[in-house]
């Protein structure tokens, strides 16, 4: 039991060791599962359905990780016995062959961050020794054929850990972004409350009936008058700079809120726009928290391009940085376009300034593209940070994969900058500007009203299909009647949602692409 004791099989391992380790693993797993279940119960009690669905998305990601882990464990023996010629593995290496020889010569005397972590986590060192023993077996298997293993057990083990670190980092960064962003958005609640108070102020009501010059309005002064009035380039420059300071002002909030209400629910001027905006953001959050298939494709491409001398880690850090600046600039420019439309059409107005929301202000007339970009930005930034810490813990700070210090520091600075800017500027901007499209989202209704509307729409669709089928039948057959509850095709009473009677609907669109299934198209002709 001396030197080879660490390689003993389960047959010669004490039962108390097996039972103890099994107990710890099962206890930790059950604790995490119960904790997630508790969070789900709390969200249900508070009627936070979007956040509950986001939690379910996290559970799906954990299940996917478990399945990936199972596949790697089951097939690691088969993968390690897949042998190839040595010259096949001499191309597209993350580190040069000289670096590998230098690392092998100095491995026994260099103290790295990896060894520091192994001091506190002895199981890591034990795992590496066990992997070394298995690696010797697999190398012997392939050497008999004059070949080398395609992927060593140790490399497979490190890849296994990286996938877990990446997924956990992405979920963590998304949650932190939404928490910090929601904190910023909650500061706007005082503006919503002040608007509600002004409705009962006689002086405010009298002032709204006055005729005012458009260029004297604070919203127009901020977005139309100034350096961007007569130049497109200067206008975009102003939008670019504004995302770094006062990205959303009170005049922005008041004007955009009024434009939304007058366009989509004119009959309900008392709509709590702030509460609706928060519900819509929670709906969007469940789209962002997961790792979509196209993000996994990005991971594979990045792992493929991680070639020595290309400095892929350094250049890839600029992708989310550039995208984040572009998204923030575009969102600010949408607000500027709304101001330009009003200022160019009117000289003076009676009452409040009203803007006209439209999909035409967004890229390809699709506001949901912005959400996809934010999703990619958060994932790529999480990928960058996760990869850094994974390399640091696994191979050490001086690893050739880590790169030189002059490439490491800018990456970390950019990563922190992206996280802060996205949390406190871009996400709040998206929360309000995304409402400036041609459609409003189903979050405008309370949950019980949403269920009633969806049920009503399904019944209308079923009756329409039955009528279409009957009209295509024999001419002599009797036509299907409309039925007692389908006379006018009007929506049923929504009970607590009767306050939304001012919202006129022509149809409820439920598409399969992206987050458009959250949108309801209003009828502007009524």
UniProtKB/Swiss-Prot annotation:
Listed transmembrane segments: 12-32, 62-82, 161-181, 288-308, 309-329, 373-393, 413-433
GO molecular function: calmodulin binding
Cysteines engaged in disulfide bonds, as pairs: none
Cytoplasmic side: 33-61, 182-287, 330-372, 434-526
The keyword Transport appears for this protein: no
A GO cellular-component term linked to this record: plasma membrane
Record bears the keyword Transmembrane helix: yes
Membrane topology per record: Multi-pass membrane protein
Membrane side Extracellular: residue ranges: 1-11, 83-160, 394-412
Residues covered by region (Disordered): 471-526
Biased composition regions of type Polar residues, renumbered to the chain: 506-520
Main location: membrane
Localization annotation: Cell membrane
Effect of residue 456 to R: Disturbs binding to calmodulin
Composition-biased stretches (Low complexity): 476-495
Keywords, comma-separated and alphabetical: Calmodulin-binding, Cell membrane, Membrane, Pathogenesis-related protein, Plant defense, Transmembrane, Transmembrane helix
Any one GO biological process: defense response
Cited Pfam families: Mlo
InterPro entries: Mlo
Region annotation Calmodulin-binding: where it falls in the sequence: 447-468
PANTHER family hit by this protein: MLO-LIKE PROTEIN 1 (PTHR31942:SF52)
Free-text function comment from the UniProt entry: May be involved in modulation of pathogen defense and leaf cell death. Activity seems to be regulated by Ca(2+)-dependent calmodulin binding and seems not to require heterotrimeric G proteins.
Domain comment (free text): The C-terminus contains a calmodulin-binding domain, which binds calmodulin in a calcium-dependent fashion.
Family: Belongs to the MLO family.
Name this polypeptide is given: MLO-like protein 1
UniProt organism field: Arabidopsis thaliana (Mouse-ear cress)
Primary gene name: MLO1
């Amino acid at each position: 039991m001396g030197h080879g004791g660490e390689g003993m099989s389960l047959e010669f391992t004490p039962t108390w060791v097996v039972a103890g380790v099994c107990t710890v693993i099962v206890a930790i797993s059950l604790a995490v599962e119960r904790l997630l279940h508790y969070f789900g119960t709390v969200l249900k009690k508070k009627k936070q359905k979007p956040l509950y669905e986001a939690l379910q998305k996290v559970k799906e990601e954990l299940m996917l990780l478990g399945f990936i882990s199972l596949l790697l464990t089951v097939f690691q023996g088969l993968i390690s016995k897949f042998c190839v010629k040595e010259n096949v593995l001499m191309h597209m290496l993350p580190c040069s062959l000289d670096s590998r020889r230098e690392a092998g010569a100095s491995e026994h005397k260099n103290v790295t961050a990896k060894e520091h972590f192994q001091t506190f986590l002895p199981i890591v060192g034990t795992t590496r020794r066990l992997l070394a023993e298995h690696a010797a077996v697999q190398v012997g298997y392939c050497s008999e054929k004059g070949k080398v293993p395609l992927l060593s057990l140790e490399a497979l083990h490190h890849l296994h850990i990286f996938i877990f670190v990446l997924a956990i980092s992405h979920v963590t960064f998304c949650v932190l972004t939404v928490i910090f962003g929601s904190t910023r958005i909650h500061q706007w609640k005082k503006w919503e409350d002040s608007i509600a108070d002004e409705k009962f102020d006689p002086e405010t009501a009298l002032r709204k009936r006055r005729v005012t010059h458009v260029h004297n309005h604070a919203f127009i002064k901020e977005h139309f008058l100034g350096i961007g009035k007569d130049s497109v380039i200067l206008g975009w420059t102003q939008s670019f700079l504004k995302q770094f300071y006062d990205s959303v002002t009170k005049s922005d909030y008041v004007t955009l809120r009024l434009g939304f209400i007058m366009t989509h629910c004119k009959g309900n001027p008392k709509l709590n726009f702030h509460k609706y905006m928060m519900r819509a953001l929670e709906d969007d959050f469940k789209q962002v928290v997961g790792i979509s298939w196209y993000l996994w494709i990005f991971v594979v491409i990045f792992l493929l391009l991680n070639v020595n001398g290309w400095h892929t880690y350094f250049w890839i850090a600029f992708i989310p940085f550039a995208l984040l600046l572009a998204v923030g600039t575009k969102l600010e420019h949408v607000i500027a376009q709304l101001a330009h439309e009003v200022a160019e059409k009117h000289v003076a107005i009676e009452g409040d300034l009203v803007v006209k929301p439209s999909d035409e202000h967004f890229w390809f007339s699709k506001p949901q593209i912005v959400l996809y970009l934010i999703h990619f930005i958060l994932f790529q930034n999480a990928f960058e940070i996760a990869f850094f810490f994974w390399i640091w813990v696994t191979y050490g700070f001086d690893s050739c994969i880590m790169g030189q210090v002059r490439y490491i520091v800018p990456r970390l600075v950019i990563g922190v900058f992206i996280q802060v800017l996205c949390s406190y500027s871009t996400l709040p901007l998206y929360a309000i500007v995304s409402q400036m499209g041609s459609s409003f989202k189903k979050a405008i209704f309370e949950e019980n009203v949403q269920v009633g509307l969806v049920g009503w729409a399904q019944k209308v669709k079923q009756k329409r299909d039955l009528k279409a089928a009957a009209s295509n039948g024999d001419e002599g057959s009797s036509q299907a009647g409309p039925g007692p509850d389908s006379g006018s095709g009007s929506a049923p009473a929504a009970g607590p949602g009767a306050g939304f009677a001012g919202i006129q609907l022509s149809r409820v669109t439920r598409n399969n692409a992206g987050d458009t299934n959250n949108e309801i198209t209003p009828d502007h002709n009524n």
